[in-house]
Swiss-Prot record:
Coiled coil: none annotated. The gene is prfA. Keywords: Cytoplasm, Methylation, Protein biosynthesis. PANTHER family: LD18447P. One of its GO terms (cellular component) is cytoplasm. This is Peptide chain release factor 1. The modification N5-methylglutamine is found at residue 235. Transmembrane segments: none annotated. The keyword Isomerase does not apply. SUPFAM superfamilies: Release factor.
């Protein structure tokens, strides 16, 4: 199917939706909201297609002028220049439409759960968990997104074994989904007297927040344990048993939350994280199956799970997936990460274009 055929189908779908929205007999709010959502999803495509049709018409008219034996040379020359400009305009619109027509990641618009954990490197890894957490906090402060801390496990040296937080707002998953993976840090620890550079790593998981309709958790499938909250070094930070640990028996997934003073709030947050982890597990299995099928067709393109290196002595950050290096790590750690996240999103689109090209 050519791109024009695809655009014609989208335009027909759009016209059908508009007709239904103008139908006074449709009064169900859920139906109306669903139609409005579908309309907004393809509105930009239809508008760009209208522009394309205008340009194609102008190209046709200019070609007729050039091919007309009665047209004088000066007008033909002007028409040829006009055709050149119009063809460039057409190419720009078509390229934009190819991107708009790409299949959307169904999770892009969802809120997310982010988990940052220690990897290799002991105390240095725990300190870097804190650095990454501050980096994402500052990044989110620069956007219209909102963050809520779900659970933290601080260490005595000021780092974290684990930080879990949620991010809500427009396209939260699309904005941060490329942060999942192993983040490697190279720097001289404060305790290192010899000035040697140490390498450690922390891991980041970005999961779409699952709705109750996405993942159903049965009461008989979970075990809930209540215990007293603890801080760095294991000392008690709460006089009541308000911390909650939930074990999902079918998968063996375990989530705990102790940041709230209320047991009920901790349980609700823990369930939200558990639901996201189950959803992510199911999505990963589905994607692995699709990737396996695709590899059988086009060969393997696996990459290392290490996605990024942060080199503090050189003030350098390198993203290994796109081979981009920036020498402004200080600003990157202050939340200025969009240069790389935008490049990753662009690469995803380019890869999809290559896969879905006509």
């Amino acid at each position: 199917m050519s791109i024009i055929d695809k655009l014609s189908l989208v335009e027909k779908t759009y016209e059908d939706i508009v007709q239904k929205l103008n139908d006074a007999n449709i009064k169900d709010n859920r139906v109306i909201q669903d139609l409005m959502k579908k309309k907004s999803e393809i509105e930009d495509i239809v508008e760009e297609y209208k522009k394309l049709k205008v340009v194609l018409k102008e190209i046709e008219e200019s070609n007729e002028m050039v091919n007309n034996p009665d047209t004088d040379k000066e007008l033909k020359d002007m028409a040829l220049l006009e055709i050149e400009d119009l063809n460039q305009k057409k190419e720009d619109i078509v390229n934009g439409l190819r991107l708009l027509l790409l299949p959307k990641d169904k999770n892009d618009g969802k809120n997310i759960i982010v988990e940052i954990r220690v990897g290799t490197g002991g105390d240095e890894s725990a300190l870097f968990v804190g650095d990454l957490f501050r980096m994402y906090t500052r990044f989110i402060e620069r956007t219209n997104l909102k963050m809520e801390i779900i659970d933290t496990s601080p260490t005595e040296l000021g780092g974290y074994k684990e930080v879990i937080f949620s991010v809500s707002g427009k396209d939260a998953y699309r904005t941060l989904k490329f942060e999942s993976g192993t983040h490697r840090v190279q720097r001289i620890p404060a305790t290192e007297s010899g000035g040697r550079i140490h390498t450690s790593a922390s891991t980041v998981a970005v999961m779409p927040e699952a709705m109750e309709s996405d993942v159903v958790i049965k009461d008989e499938d979970i075990r809930v344990d209540i215990f007293r909250s603890s801080g760095p070094g294991g000392q008690s930070v709460n006089t009541t048993d308000s911390a909650v640990r939930i074990t999902h028996l079918p998968t063996g997934l375990v989530v705990q939350c102790q940041d709230e003073k209320s047991q009920h709030k901790n349980k609700a947050k823990a369930l939200k994280v558990l639901r996201a982890r189950i959803y992510e597990k199911e999505e990963a299995e589905r994607k692995a199956k699709e990737a396996k099928e695709r590899r059988e067709q086009i060969g393997s393109g696996d990459r290392s799970e290490r996605i990024r290196t942060y080199n503090f002595p050189q003030n350098r950050v390198t993203d290994h997936r796109i081979n981009v290096t920036l020498y402004k790590l200080d600003r990157f750690m202050d939340g200025e990460i969009t240069e790389i996240t935008d490049a990753l999103f662009k690469k995803e689109q380019e890869d999809m274009l290559a896969s879905y090209s006509d």
